Amino acid sequence: MNHSLKPWNTFGIDHNAQHIVCAEDEQQLLNAWQHATAEGQPVLILGEGSNVLFLEDYRGTVIINRIKGIEIHDEPDAWYLHVGAGENWHRLVKYTLQEGMPGLENLALIPGCVGSSPIQNIGAYGVELQRVCAYVDCVELATGKQVRLTAKECRFGYRDSIFKHEYQDRFAIVAVGLRLPKEWQPVLTYGDLTRLEPTTVTPQQVFNAVCHMRTTKLPDPKVNGNAGSFFKNPVVSAETAKALLSQFPTAPNYPQADGSVKLAAGWLIDQCQLKGMQMGGAAVHRQQALVLINEDNAKSEDVVQLAHHVRQKVGEKFNVWLEPEVRFIGASGEVSAVETIS
């Protein structure tokens, strides 16, 4: 148990794993998984560890997915990209813009790897991965069988997909296929983007605005460890939203296609005067209440205690119960984040 996980999670929480293996191709990944499984060890596959909280030492093998490569197919209607799971997401966004292939600009500066993007159906500023995803290539770990899932088969939801359910722990994502339509249409529904002029705006301007919003509001994990948005924005029924808005008319709310309403978790937390609140080494970020940070050598217990406190305060004030977006990892695998902080 002497391999530190600190460099492999952006929260910078110091726990250990029995083994850590970097896999640069599918075969190395399969070999590492099969070797660990044969020895009866649990296995966790990570990209950049930007959406995990290790609760304790991991009693198994952590495989770091570093499968690289970007292939582009130019079709009359769209650019089709085949991207290795180990590619850095933000570098991919920058690369596509430099090559004149817009469509990912709203998703700039989301931390992590391309392979993690379908698991969470990553999203920001009005765009989710499902908008541009053509397929996801995975490998069945027990058999080595290759499987390609269409976007529909991925069953994307809000921060959700089949990779959090039936495919969890059984399949590893090795590549993601993206479709970027040549008829670019800006999405300017959130934040400072609403100020941009839809008829003249360029993809680069959207990218710059998103980067500006993220860098001014969000902490740099190299300075204060964090995993980005700690909580999901809660999606509530129209009735719940109506009741809440009658009491708090200024609450940001986003009606969804199915009649439900998405609320802004950051606003709810902020209304409870929790910005800057610290427990042990963990704190609520002072600019963006949705982010919990490693202020001062935080232990995982500090983060859990703080998350519990935030959830309680928001629940008591608004009767809305926040759920973590971050994945909680116990000694032998993922555990329920909601149960851990309830």
Swiss-Prot record:
For this protein, the record's Pfam families field holds: FAD_binding_4, MurB_C
Q: Which PANTHER family match?
A: UDP-N-ACETYLENOLPYRUVOYLGLUCOSAMINE REDUCTASE
Cofactor(s) the record lists: FAD
Return the InterPro entries for the record. Answer: FAD-bd_PCMH (IPR016166), FAD-bd_PCMH-like_sf (IPR036318), FAD-bd_PCMH_sub1 (IPR016167), FAD-bd_PCMH_sub2 (IPR016169), MurB (IPR003170), MurB_C (IPR011601), MurB_C_sf (IPR036635), Oxid_FAD_bind_N (IPR006094)
What top-level branch of life does the organism fall under? Bacteria
* A GO MF label: UDP-N-acetylmuramate dehydrogenase activity
What name is this protein filed under?
A: UDP-N-acetylenolpyruvoylglucosamine reductase
Q: Where is the FAD-binding PCMH-type domain?
A: 13-183
Q: Which gene encodes it?
A: murB
Q: Which reaction does it catalyse?
A: UDP-N-acetyl-alpha-D-muramate + NADP(+) = UDP-N-acetyl-3-O-(1-carboxyvinyl)-alpha-D-glucosamine + NADPH + H(+)
**Catalytic residues as annotated in Swiss-Prot or TrEMBL:** R159, S229 (proton donor), E325
SUPFAM superfamilies, A to Z: FAD-binding/transporter-associated domain-like, Uridine diphospho-N-Acetylenolpyruvylglucosamine reductase, MurB, C-terminal domain
Annotated Gene Ontology cellular component terms: cytosol
Family statement: Belongs to the MurB family.
Per the record, the pathway is: Cell wall biogenesis; peptidoglycan biosynthesis
**Source organism of this protein record:** Shigella dysenteriae serotype 1 (strain Sd197)
Q: What does this protein do?
A: Cell wall formation.
Where found, per UniProt?
Answer: Cytoplasm
> What's the EC number here?
1.3.1.98
Q: Name one GO biological process term.
A: peptidoglycan biosynthetic process
- Keywords in UniProt for this one? Cell cycle, Cell division, Cell shape, Cell wall biogenesis/degradation, Cytoplasm, FAD, Flavoprotein, NADP, Oxidoreductase, Peptidoglycan synthesis
